[in-house]
């Protein structure tokens, strides 16, 4: 299973501005690129705060064939949103989540955040690539890309300036 962590971050490494969840602050160029990039994946994993930020949008896409799993300590709190095989909630480990996806014949997973999900998958050694859009903004505080101490080596795959913007997309391979 290919697992790609996809994220937009400020130049100083924050994925959410101050105490505001979500990436509404990201450039329109990144938002266009992100929507297109998601088409390369047949499944998505995110933490519950990320889910709550995009809940209404995701629930309207439940029939698009993408299997979405939301990591939460309390899956029962989301029972009303559960759609088996399309949108599921779990407190399982990252390895167990990937087994569920693999058993459902999924091959490419977009890891969408937030920092809790990033930490769990990186700590487990399950991330193959990281695609980060570096936005030309400095926040000074907010939600970091990761919260736990990490020492993960990466190798650059590519970098490109997103069209009509000052945003930089960098793709890395995780060295295992």
Task: Please report, for each region that a protein language model flagged, where it lies by residue.
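Enzymes that bind and transform nitrogen-containing heteroaromatic metabolites
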Residues: 1-176
């Amino acid at each position: 299973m290919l697992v790609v962590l996809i994220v937009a971050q400020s130049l100083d490494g924050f994925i959410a501005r101050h105490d505001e969840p979500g990436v509404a602050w990201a450039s329109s160029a990144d938002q266009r690129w992100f929507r297109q990039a998601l088409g390369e994946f047949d499944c998505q994993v995110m933490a519950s705060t990320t889910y709550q930020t995009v809940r209404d949008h995701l629930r309207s896409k439940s029939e698009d064939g993408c299997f979405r799993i939301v990591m939460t300590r309390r899956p029962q709190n989301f029972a009303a949103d559960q759609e088996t095989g399309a949108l599921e909630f779990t407190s399982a480990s990252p390895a167990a989540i990937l087994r569920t996806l693999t058993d459902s014949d999924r091959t490419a997973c977009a890891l969408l955040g937030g920092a809790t999900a990033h930490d769990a998958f990186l700590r487990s050694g399950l991330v193959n690539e990281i695609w980060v859009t570096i936005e030309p903004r400095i926040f000074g505080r907010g939600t970091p890309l990761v919260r736990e101490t990490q020492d993960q080596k990466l190798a650059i795959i590519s970098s490109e300036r997103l069209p009509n913007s000052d945003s930089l997309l960098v793709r890395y391979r995780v060295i295992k």
